[in-house]
C-alpha cells in the first residue's frame, strides 16, 4: 500500500484576494475650504433685529426682517426662496432661486441650476435702487475626484473690462486636497493676475487648510473636541494692506438646554460672543451678542428674535 495523496477540492484552493481601493472623494468647492473653521466664529451683531420666517409650500418660503440700529436708519428686508424638485444632497436642491430686497429697492438675487449631473451654474445679481452693481456668472464641473470652476464677474464688452476667476481642486488622497486659484482682471489701462495655491488636510477630528499666493496667505485650523465643543484658529495676511490678523474661535453646544455659544478673540484686541437659545416648544430663537474692540475703544451689542 502506498501513501495516499489527498487532493483538496478545487473550490477550497486558496485564492489571492485583491483589495479593491476605494475611489477618491470629490473635494467640493474652493469657496468651502475654510467653512468648518469659519462656522465656529460668531457673526457680528449690532442693534435689534426681528426675523419672521414663513413656509408657504414645500418649494417656496419668505422671510421678513426688521433691523433697528444706532449706526443707521431702521431697515426692512424681504427675503424669498424657491427650491425645485431635484434634491442632489441634503443641502443641495435644484433649481434654487433666492432674492432679498430692502426698503430702498436694492436687490440681491441668486439663481442655482443643475445643467447636467456634474455641471452646475450660478448667476448672481446685485442692484442699488435702479443701478446695477454686480452681475456674476459661475460654471462648476464636479468630477469623481476633482472640481473645476470658472467665474465671470461684471463682464462689459463695451468698456472692455472683466474679472475672471478659475478654481481647481484635486483629491490626492482620501485626506489630502490640493488646488489653486487664478484671478484675472482687466479694464482700460490696467491688467493683472494673481495666483494662489491651496491645500487641505482632513483628519478624523481636525482639518487644516492653507491658501498662499502673491496677495497674501490664509491659514485655518478646525478641531472638534467632542459633540459639544469645537474650536477654530485662523490666520490672515494681506500683502497689499500690510496687515496680519490672528483669530481664535470657540463653539459650545448645550443640547439639553437648547443653547449655542460662540466666542472669539483676535490680535486686534477684539473680543466677542453670541449666545443663542431656542424657546421650545415655541418656534422662536433668541440671540444676544456683544463685541468689544479694546484698541479702538468700540463696543457693539445686539439682540435678535427669529420666529419660524
Swiss-Prot record:
Keywords: Membrane, Mitochondrion, Mitochondrion outer membrane, Protein transport, Transmembrane, Transmembrane beta strand, Transport. Residues 281-308 are annotated as: Required for mitochondrial targeting. It comes from the Eukaryota. GO terms for biological process: protein import into mitochondrial matrix. One of its GO terms (cellular component) is mitochondrial outer membrane translocase complex. One of its GO terms (molecular function) is protein transmembrane transporter activity. Forms part of the preprotein translocase of the outer mitochondrial membrane (TOM complex) containing TOMM22, TOMM40, TOMM40L and TOMM70. Interacts with mitochondrial targeting sequences. PANTHER family: MITOCHONDRIAL IMPORT RECEPTOR SUBUNIT TOM40. Potential channel-forming protein implicated in import of protein precursors into mitochondria. This is Mitochondrial import receptor subunit TOM40B. It comes from Rattus norvegicus (Rat). The lineage of its organism: Eukaryota, Metazoa, Chordata, Craniata, Vertebrata. The gene is Tomm40l.
Amino acid at each position: 500500500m502506498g501513501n495516499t495523496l489527498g487532493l483538496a477540492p478545487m473550490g477550497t484552493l486558496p485564492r489571492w484576494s485583491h483589495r479593491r481601493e476605494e475611489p477618491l472623494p470629490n473635494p467640493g468647492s474652493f469657496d468651502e475650504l475654510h467653512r468648518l473653521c469659519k462656522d465656529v466664529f460668531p457673526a457680528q451683531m449690532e442693534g435689534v433685529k426681528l426675523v419672521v420666517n414663513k413656509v408657504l409650500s414645500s418649494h417656496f418660503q419668505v422671510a421678513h426682517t426688521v433691523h433697528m440700529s444706532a449706526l443707521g436708519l431702521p431697515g426692512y428686508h424681504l427675503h424669498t426662496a424657491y427650491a425645485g424638485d431635484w434634491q442632489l444632497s441634503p443641502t443641495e436642491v435644484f433649481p434654487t432661486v433666492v432674492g432679498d430686497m430692502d426698503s430702498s429697492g436694492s436687490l440681491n438675487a441668486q439663481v442655482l441650476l443643475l445643467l447636467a449631473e456634474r455641471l452646475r451654474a450660478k448667476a448672481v445679481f446685485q442692484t442699488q435702487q435702479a443701478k446695477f452693481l454686480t452681475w456674476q456668472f459661475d460654471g462648476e464641473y464636479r468630477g469623481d475626484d476633482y472640481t473645476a470652476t470658472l467665474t465671470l464677474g461684471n463682464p462689459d464688452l463695451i468698456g472692455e473690462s472683466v474679472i475672471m476667476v478659475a478654481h481647481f481642486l484635486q483629491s490626492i488622497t482620501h485626506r489630502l486636497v490640493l488646488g489653486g486659484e487664478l484671478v484675472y482682471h482687466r479694464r482700460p489701462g490696467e491688467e493683472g493676475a494673481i495666483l494662489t495655491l491651496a491645500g487641505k488636510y482632513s483628519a478624523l477630528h481636525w482639518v487644516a487648510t492653507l491658501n498662499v499666493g502673491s496677495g497674501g496667505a490664509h491659514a485655518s485650523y478646525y478641531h472638534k473636541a467632542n459633540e459639544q465643543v469645537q474650536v477654530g484658529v485662523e490666520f490672515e495676511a494681506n500683502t497689499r494692506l500690510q496687515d496680519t490678523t490672528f483669530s481664535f474661535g470657540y463653539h459650545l453646544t448645550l443640547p439639553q438646554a437648547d443653547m449655542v455659544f460662540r466666542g472669539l478673540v483676535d490680535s486686534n484686541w477684539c473680543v466677542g460672543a453670541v449666545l443663542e437659545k431656542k424657546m421650545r416648544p415655541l418656534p422662536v430663537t433668541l440671540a444676544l451678542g456683544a463685541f468689544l474692540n479694546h484698541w479702538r475703544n468700540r463696543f457693539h451689542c445686539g439682540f435678535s428674535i427669529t420666529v419660524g
